[in-house]
Regions:
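"A position-specific structural signal for the A-helix of alpha-solenoid helical repeats
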Residues: 17, 51, 58, 65, ...
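Helix-turn-helix repeat elements of alpha-solenoid scaffolds
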Residues: 24-40, 66-83, 111-127, 154-162, ...
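Alpha-solenoid helical repeat scaffolds
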Residues: 39-42, 77, 84, 120, ...
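Flexible helix-coil transition and linker loops at the boundaries of alpha-helical arrays
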Residues: 41-48, 82-93, 125-139, 178, ...
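Residue-level recognition of tetratricopeptide repeat
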Residues: 52, 86, 95, 174-175, ...
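TPR alpha-solenoid repeat register
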Residues: 55, 98, 132, 178, ...
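Residue-level signature for tetratricopeptide repeat
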Residues: 62, 105, 149-151, 185, ...
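Short coil/turn linking the two alpha-helices of tandem helical-hairpin repeats
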Residues: 87-88, 110, 152-155, 183, ...
């Protein structure tokens, strides 16, 4: 490539970086599960849902990330066609993101003239809409599409998605598309431990009600609202909403899935499985549906385990147990088949079923693979360390490995249920050890760590000093003791 063409390319890249489209938003190859997203987007396109153009646009981006540029162009042509049909008068406003994506794909293909032609189109569209950048306009349609794209990508983008919908609603306050987006972002954030939204976990209710005021046919809003009302013990209205949603949208997978969750939480497992299998018939690769079915069968399996007859191979209860084990393993296995980096809970549930069936080596393989994964969220790593630690403690009888894993779990200070379980397991293990041998340096060190976490510095110092009596060259204890003494002295000097 000569200097001149390189300069043209670089200048073009500077313009492309100013665009508002999938290529300039946060989610990139490293932060999204591409295989899983491709399946979800394909399902959405195949179902021919209301906002199919949105899925085509995001599919173009995912295809481009994988170097499938010709497929990406086809996705964008499909998106453009749908937008022209659905938004005749508002097509130009709706096309800003699609044209931005076109420009980026042509750039990656080395087709710089074509890329520039889309920048020219964007300049003509955006000029009357904004006094800002030449090639984009921060209008509700752009904020809204960005919000939905972020929501589809990963939990780490939910806060930003909510902010995008907020911006869209500032100019277009009665748009159900953006209110639904805002409600969905809130709804998801309310389910995540430690988020400010979790502390005020009914905010989404008002926004979902607003969606239904403006669009009484929005069945997904109905089932989402029903789940929030169920959480708040408003069972009668919740039940009516679910039935209404199923009448209006008897074949929409997202509606069926959320309705199934409602019935599962009401202990109506068979009804939940029936709805989930119906949804699976329409979207056979949907990993979330497989996970939900696995959870329903798991509830049934745990009930069967309570019956002593289930351990007698001659008894029908035993046969039922084996059938349920197969169902659980099949569906949990399908749930993480294409998304090993994101379907962590499904893999942990699969390992749990293996352990209950005496398949310890198979469970061990699952834990080993999980411990090797990279780029996992801290919350998911914490779950892995807890479950792998329990496996090491109870099945492998390896105290040192178990303690190491529980300690890793404590380093993620989120005060979650999983964090508390790591703490409790360490405390229980240390107490048990010290009852047998009061000179056990490892157990004394663990007690020191737990007191340090609790903020009881004098007790922590006492335990670390005692641990060092029996393991005088332990660098971990020496370092902790040094840090504690300094902190203790500073506090008392004040």
């Amino acid at each position: 490539m000569n200097t001149m063409s390189k300069t043209v390319r670089e200048l073009l890249k500077e313009k492309l970086d100013q665009l508002q489209c999938h290529f300039t938003w946060g989610p990139q190859k490293e932060t999204i599960d591409l295989d899983d997203m491709m399946y979800r987007l394909q399902d959405s396109i195949d179902l021919n849902l209301k906002y199919k153009a949105r899925s085509c646009n995001q599919f173009a981006f995912v295809n481009s990330l994988q170097g499938n540029y010709e497929e990406a162009i086809q996705n964008l042509k499909e998106a453009e066609k749908i937008l022209r049909e659905n938004y005749k008068d508002a097509f130009e406003r709706r096309s800003i993101i699609t044209y931005g994506n076109y420009a980026w794909v042509h750039y990656h293909m080395g087709q710089l003239t074509e890329a520039q032609s889309y920048l020219d189109k964007l300049e003509m569209i955006c000029k009357p809409l904004t006094d800002g950048p030449r090639y984009t306009a921060m209008i509700p349609e752009v904020y809204g599409e960005k919000g939905w794209s972020l929501l589809r990508s990963a939990a780490q983008y939910y806060e930003e998605a909510m902010e995008c919908f907020e911006k869209a609603l500032e100019e277009d306050p009665n748009n159900t598309e953006w209110i639904m987006g805002f409600a969905t972002a809130l709804y998801r954030l309310e389910a995540i431990p430690g988020t400010p939204e979790k502390c005020k976990s009914s905010q989404s209710v008002n926004h979902l009600r607003r969606v239904l005021e403006l669009d009484p046919e929005e069945s997904l809003a109905m089932v989402m609202l029903a789940l929030k009302l169920q959480e708040n013990k408003q069972k009668k209205e919740a039940n009516e909403l679910v039935q209404q949603a199923l009448q209006k949208s008897p074949d929409v997978p997202k509606v069926l899935r959320n309705a199934a969750k409602f019935y599962r939480l009401e202990q109506a497992g068979e009804k939940a499985i029936e709805l989930l299998k119906k949804a699976l018939g329409r979207t056979p690769h949907n990993s979330v549906l497989h996970d939900q079915i696995g959870m329903c069968y798991r509830v049934q399996l745990l009930e069967v385990f309570k019956n002593p007859l289930s351990s007698d191979p001659q008894n029908p209860e035993f046969q039922q147990k084996m059938v349920l084990i197969d169902h659980c393993k099949h569906h949990f296995g399908k749930a993480f088949e294409h998304r090993p980096r994101t379907a962590i809970k499904s893999q942990l549930d699969y390992a749990d079923i293996c352990l209950r069936n005496g398949e310890n080596s198979k469970a061990g393989e699952v834990y080993s693979k999980l411990l090797e994964l990279e780029g996992i969220s801290p919350e998911n790593m914490q779950r892995i360390w807890l479950q792998a630690g329990l496996f090491q403690l109870h099945k492998r009888k390896s105290d040192s490995n178990a303690v190491q894993l529980f300690q890793k779990g404590l380093k993620i200070e989120n005060n979650s249920k999983v964090w508390k379980m790591c703490y409790e397991n360490l405390d229980k293990w240390a107490e048990k050890k010290l009852c047998r041998d009061s000179h056990d340096s490892k157990a004394l060190g663990v007690k020191g760590l737990l007191h340090q976490i609790d903020g009881d510095k004098s007790k922590a110092i006492e335990y670390f000093e005692e641990a060092l009596e029996f393991d005088p060259s332990n660098e971990e204890y020496l370092s902790a003791l040094c840090e504690l003494r300094l902190s203790f002295e500073e506090h008392h000097d004040l």
